[in-house]
């Protein structure tokens, strides 16, 4: 696919971070499904061991730029960006602009100020907008009868709201993308217009999607505070107990430090501890709801933690009782056809991951993995016309596209349609297993330190 240079660039700055003691996450997003990422040390997750799919990362039938997001220690992320600037030249590296927009409450206050209306009046109207994500003024008028009444009876309110609705959603100000960095072969200003932020940082004047459309190389350097906590906890353990703990060991490599202790990801004591729900401070597992879920789940493997992180989200949460019942009562699990069993057995008969949708259409209907990723994408983005067309292909096949179809594989029409319906329902919310696996490793690492070295872990957590 011609991405050798891309992987080498990513490997280079990750290698710089590791060799300079800057904590790097085990992986993030679909890149953890790449064996090349694993063997080069870009990620620490073995995709074969956890059955992660490469085509979820790069699809040979829908060629796009790879997207490897990397988590670094929150406090030292800037050092990695500085290294990239020095290596490739300040003229060839830039951060990316973002545009803040006039949202419902903000636009009312801004328009009111321009109209010279009293601040208290505008603030009262703005506070009547419900605190809902992506709320619009029009939706607020439908949801709040009091606001609707004022709009219909007060000319000042009506003028303010009508003008605000016309401006709602327009760009208000610029800021810098929290993670995006662009690297170019020639001077950046030969490709895109640039600007200088208030702190002197050079940024593109094009947003991230435009940068990607132009074919420029975009990387995401993210800061994850938990990595700092883990590093500080490991340092305190060595200082207090003389024990070195290697959290970044990759299985296929020779262990370079014979004195270091490796974390056992099948440690029953750590898994049982997670199952007690005493996971305050444990990455991804510290909310009240997640603690209760862990008490019900009682994970027995890292796979259970991966599934837990994937399920505890709006939508998939409805399947938690079925998942737990299947885990505890294996005899209660049923499959529409025998071909589903090896795919869904690890998740007790439930579709939990996007990768499982891909495996189902490949194994049952004969899609290629590239075609399977395309249908997974269509389902997650709710492209109904694609979903309807693919149902025909899934059930009956499509000779022109090389799809055999379920019926040709001995699966009944009724069962095939039922399986397809369940995929459509769940694919809207299904989680990327590669990302869940990487973050489950971080969750487990924090639980490991909290269980075995609670003093050092809590000191690191409070310091951060």
Report residues per predicted region.
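Alpha-helical scaffold/interaction cores of sigma-54-like transcription cofactors
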Residues: 1-464
């Amino acid at each position: 696919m011609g991405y050798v240079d891309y992987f080498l660039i990513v490997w280079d700055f990750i290698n710089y971070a590791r060799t300079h003691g800057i904590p790097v996450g085990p992986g993030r997003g679909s890149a953890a499904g790449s064996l090349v990422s694993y063997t080069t040390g870009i990620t620490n997750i073995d995709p074969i061991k956890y059955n992660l799919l490469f085509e979820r990362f790069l699809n040979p039938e829908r060629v796009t730029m790879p997207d490897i997001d990397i988590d670094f220690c929150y406090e030292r992320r800037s050092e990695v960006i500085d290294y990239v600037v020095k290596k490739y030249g300040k003229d060839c590296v830039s951060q990316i602009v973002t545009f803040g927009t006039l949202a419902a409450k903000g636009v009312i206050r801004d328009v009111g100020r321009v109209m010279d209306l009293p601040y208290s009046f505008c603030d009262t109207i703005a506070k009547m907008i419900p605190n809902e994500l992506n709320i619009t003024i029009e939706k607020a008028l439908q949801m709040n009868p009091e606001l609707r009444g004022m709009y219909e009876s007060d000319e000042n309110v009506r003028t303010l709201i009508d003008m605000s609705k016309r401006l709602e959603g327009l760009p208000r100000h610029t800021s810098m993308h929290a993670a995006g960095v662009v690297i170019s072969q020639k001077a950046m200003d030969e490709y895109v217009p640039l600007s200088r932020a208030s702190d002197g940082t050079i940024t593109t004047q094009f947003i991230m999607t435009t940068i990607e459309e132009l074919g420029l190389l975009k990387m995401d350097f993210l800061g994850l505070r938990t990595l700092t906590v883990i590093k500080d906890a490991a340092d305190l353990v060595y200082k207090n107990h003389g024990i070195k703990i290697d959290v970044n060991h990759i299985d296929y490599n020779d262990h370079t430090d014979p004195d270091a202790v490796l974390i056992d990801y099948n440690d029953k004591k750590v898994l049982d501890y997670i199952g007690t729900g005493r996971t305050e401070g444990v990455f991804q597992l510290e909310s009240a709801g997640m603690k209760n879920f862990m008490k019900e789940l009682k994970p027995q493997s890292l796979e259970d933690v991966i599934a837990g992180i994937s399920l505890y989200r709006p939508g998939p949460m409805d399947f938690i009782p079925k998942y737990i019942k299947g885990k505890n009562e294996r005899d209660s699990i049923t499959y529409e056809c025998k071909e589903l069993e090896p795919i869904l057995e690890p998740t007790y008969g439930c579709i939990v991951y996007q990768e499982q949708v891909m495996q189902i259409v490949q194994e049952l209907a004969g899609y290629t993995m590239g075609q399977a990723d395309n249908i997974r994408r269509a389902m997650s983005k709710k492209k109904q016309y694609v979903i309807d067309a693919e149902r025909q292909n899934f059930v009956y096949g499509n000779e022109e596209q090389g799809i055999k179809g379920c019926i040709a594989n001995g699966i009944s029409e009724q069962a095939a349609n039922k399986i397809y319906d369940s995929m459509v329902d769940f694919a809207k919310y299904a989680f990327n297993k590669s990302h869940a696996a990487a973050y489950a490793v971080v969750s487990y690492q924090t639980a490991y330190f909290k269980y075995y070295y609670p003093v050092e872990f809590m000191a690191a957590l409070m310091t951060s």
